[in-house]
């Protein structure tokens, strides 16, 4: 397979170590780079000041979704795949300039051990998109759509830029929203 934008290519591995079951995900990292998703996240989201960056959080959640993750706990599946973690480390090192890598290192109080965030920081991150004041306006038994807060509006801008990229290359007049019809008992 030809090499894309990011510094990886697919090769047959003779050893057992470094093998990944998530070999298709780096192609999506390549697509995210071409689409400028990272830059869009950096431009519109300013939630994290320490530790994991907004870009790392959002891309981790996107990759989790693409890998078939059902919940935040499934981030452990990404972290537990040694081959995938090696690819992520290499991509992170290659796409950042030296100054950016140093700034990233300074965000951490302790040395970073993981490639993908654990569930606790992700839950705290996701909580930033929720406005508890809006919940006070909820009426029991009625549908309720809260007014988006600053962070959710930023995420909406990231989503708009992703759609603009796609629309710019393959214009469509109709968009279909596919919903899973699976019944879940509550």
Task: Please name every model-derived segment.
Residues 1-186:
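Dynamic "connector" segments at or just before major functional cores
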């Amino acid at each position: 397979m030809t090499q894309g934008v990011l510094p990886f290519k697919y090769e047959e591995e003779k050893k057992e170590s470094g093998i990944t079951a998530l070999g298709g995900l780096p192609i999506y990292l390549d697509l995210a780079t071409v689409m400028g998703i990272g830059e869009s996240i950096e431009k519109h989201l300013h939630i994290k000041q320490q530790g994991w960056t907004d870009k790392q959080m959002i891309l981790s959640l996107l990759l989790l979704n693409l890998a078939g993750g059902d919940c935040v706990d499934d981030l452990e599946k990404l972290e537990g795949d040694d081959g995938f973690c090696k690819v992520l480390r290499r991509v992170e090192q290659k796409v950042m300039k030296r100054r950016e890598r140093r700034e990233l290192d300074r965000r951490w109080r302790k040395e970073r051990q993981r490639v993908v965030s654990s569930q606790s920081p992700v839950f705290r991150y996701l909580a930033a998109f929720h406005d508890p004041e809006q919940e006070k306006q909820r009426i029991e038994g009625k549908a309720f759509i809260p007014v988006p807060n600053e962070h959710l509006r930023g995420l909406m801008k990231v989503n708009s830029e992703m759609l603009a990229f796609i629309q710019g290359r393959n214009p469509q007049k109709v968009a279909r929203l596919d919903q899973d019809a699976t019944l879940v008992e509550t």
